[in-house]
C-alpha cells in the first residue's frame, strides 16, 4: 500500500510540474520584457521609451524634487529633455568635429557635481550610477554636450 501512495504522490507532483511548465511556456513573452517603442524622431535620431525611462532616472538622480512629480509629468519632462539634448548635439556638430571632452576634465567635473551625494571618487560615482540603473558612458555624453554647449554660448554671446 505504501508503494501505491508514493506512486500517487509522484504522479501528482509530475502533473503539477507539467502544468506549471506549460503555463510558463505559454505566457506571453511581453510580460517579461520592457516595452520599447519609438516615440519620436529628431533629425534622424530616434527617441524610444527606454531612452525616456533612462532620462527619468537621470533627472531623478540630479533633482530630488523630480521624484515627487506625477508619472505623466516626469515622462513629458524627460522626453523634452532628450529633445533639447539632441538639438544641442546637432548644433555642436556644426562647430566641433567631435563632441567629447578630456577624460580627466569630465571625471573631475562629475565628482565635483555629485559631491552632494558624498561622491569622492570615480568608484563611488560608478556605484551611484549602477544603483540608479544608469551607465557612466551616458553620463559622460551628457556632461560633454552640456559643457560644450555652455562654451559655445559663451563664445557666441
Where are these regions (language model features)?
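Short, low-structural-confidence N-terminal segments
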Residues: 1-80, 127, 131, 154
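Peptidyl-prolyl cis-trans isomerase
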Residues: 70-157
Amino acid at each position: 500500500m505504501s508503494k501505491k501512495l508514493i506512486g500517487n504522490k509522484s504522479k501528482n507532483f509530475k502533473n503539477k510540474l507539467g502544468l506549471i511548465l506549460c503555463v510558463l511556456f505559454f505566457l506571453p513573452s511581453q510580460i517579461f520584457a520592457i516595452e520599447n517603442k519609438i516615440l519620436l524622431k529628431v533629425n534622424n535620431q530616434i527617441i524610444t521609451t527606454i531612452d525616456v525611462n533612462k532620462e527619468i532616472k537621470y533627472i531623478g538622480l540630479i533633482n530630488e524634487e523630480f521624484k515627487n512629480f506625477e508619472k505623466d509629468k516626469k515622462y513629458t519632462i524627460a522626453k523634452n529633455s532628450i529633445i533639447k539634448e539632441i538639438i544641442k548635439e546637432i548644433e555642436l556638430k556644426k562647430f566641433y568635429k567631435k563632441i567629447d571632452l578630456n577624460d580627466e576634465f569630465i571625471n573631475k567635473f562629475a565628482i565635483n557635481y555629485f559631491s552632494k551625494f558624498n561622491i569622492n571618487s570615480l568608484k563611488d560615482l560608478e556605484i551611484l550610477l549602477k544603483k540608479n540603473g544608469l551607465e557612466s558612458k551616458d553620463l559622460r555624453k551628457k556632461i560633454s554636450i552640456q559643457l560644450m554647449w555652455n562654451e559655445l554660448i559663451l563664445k557666441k554671446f
